[in-house]
């Protein structure tokens, strides 16, 4: 099995600890005036999504996690599980709602998502960085009503709510940045 030394640690690296896959969120190299150097690392458990902090002595090695990031197409959900399909082999995978998390606000049927698999089980689903979604409900923008900064809430077809400019109307398709949950522009046809 592949291993990583502490000097190879960087954000996004996937490692195994205590039998669970973790991803490195933050890595800080510390060299005290006296004693051995060490790495203070923040890790996110990919199964539970909890963040833990751990220290590793400089030069220590850890096992690489056997996780795979793959592009899968979202099909449907039945309330408990979200079903994805591999577009090349047409093989389907069921991800629990806990693995989908906040991505549920942004994905609709037929969207392609990045899914992290461990032992062929989906652990985490990431929505595309930008999605085009239709506005299903928003207040009419009244001309001259800019005291609130010129934005209003709009409910999208997936159920998510974002702040949009006053000129946006119901039925329009918007481009949304899923990382910040922000309106970017009107979608181009």
UniProtKB/Swiss-Prot annotation:
GO molecular function annotations of the record: translation elongation factor activity
SMART domains cross-referenced by the UniProt entry: EFP, Elong-fact-P_C
UniProt xrefs under PROSITE patterns: EFP (PS01275)
Pathway given in the UniProt record: Protein biosynthesis; polypeptide chain elongation
Superkingdom of origin: Bacteria
Positions bearing N6-(3,6-diaminohexanoyl)-5-hydroxylysine: 34
GO cellular component, one term: cytoplasm
InterPro entries: Elong-fact-P_C, NA-bd_OB-fold, Rib_uL2_dom2, Transl_elong_fac_P/YeiP, Transl_elong_KOW-like, Transl_elong_P/YeiP_cen, Transl_elong_P/YeiP_CS, Transl_elongation_fac_P
Post-translational modification: May be beta-lysylated on the epsilon-amino group of Lys-34 by the combined action of EpmA and EpmB, and then hydroxylated on the C5 position of the same residue by EpmC (if this protein is present). Lysylation is critical for the stimulatory effect of EF-P on peptide-bond formation. The lysylation moiety may extend toward the peptidyltransferase center and stabilize the terminal 3-CCA end of the tRNA. Hydroxylation of the C5 position on Lys-34 may allow additional potential stabilizing hydrogen-bond interactions with the P-tRNA.
Keywords: Cytoplasm, Elongation factor, Hydroxylation, Protein biosynthesis
One Pfam family named in its UniProt record: EFP_N
SUPFAM superfamilies xrefs: Nucleic acid-binding proteins, Translation proteins SH3-like domain
Gene3D superfamilies for the chain: 2.30.30.30, Nucleic acid-binding proteins
Localization: Cytoplasm
Coiled-coil region list: none
Gene Ontology terms describing biological process: peptide biosynthetic process
The protein's role, per its UniProt record: Involved in peptide bond synthesis. Alleviates ribosome stalling that occurs when 3 or more consecutive Pro residues or the sequence PPG is present in a protein, possibly by augmenting the peptidyl transferase activity of the ribosome. Modification of Lys-34 is required for alleviation.
Stated family: Belongs to the elongation factor P family.
Protein name, as recorded: Elongation factor P
Organism: Halorhodospira halophila (strain DSM 244 / SL1)
Taxonomic placement: Bacteria, Pseudomonadati, Pseudomonadota, Gammaproteobacteria, Chromatiales
Gene for this chain: efp
């Amino acid at each position: 099995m592949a291993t990583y030394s502490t000097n190879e640690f960087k954000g996004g690296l996937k490692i195994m600890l205590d039998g669970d896959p973790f991803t490195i969120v933050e890595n800080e190299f510390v060299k005290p005036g006296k004693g051995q150097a060490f790495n203070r690392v923040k890790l996110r458990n990919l199964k539970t999504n909890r963040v833990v902090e751990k220290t590793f002595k400089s030069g220590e090695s850890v096992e690489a996690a056997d996780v795979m990031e793959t592009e899968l197409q979202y099909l449907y959900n039945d309330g408990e599980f979200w079903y994805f399909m591999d577009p090349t082999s047409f093989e389907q995978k069921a991800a629990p709602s806990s693995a989908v998390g906040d991505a549920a606000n942004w994905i609709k049927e037929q969207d392609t998502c990045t899914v992290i698999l461990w032992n062929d089980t989906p652990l985490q689903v990431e929505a595309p960085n930008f999605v085009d979604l239709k506005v299903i409900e928003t207040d009419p923008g009244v001309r001259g009503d800019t005291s609130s900064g010129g934005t209003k809430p709009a409910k999208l077809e997936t159920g998510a709510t974002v702040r949009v400019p006053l000129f946006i109307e119901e039925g329009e398709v918007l481009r949304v940045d899923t990382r910040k949950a922000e309106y970017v522009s009107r979608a181009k046809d």
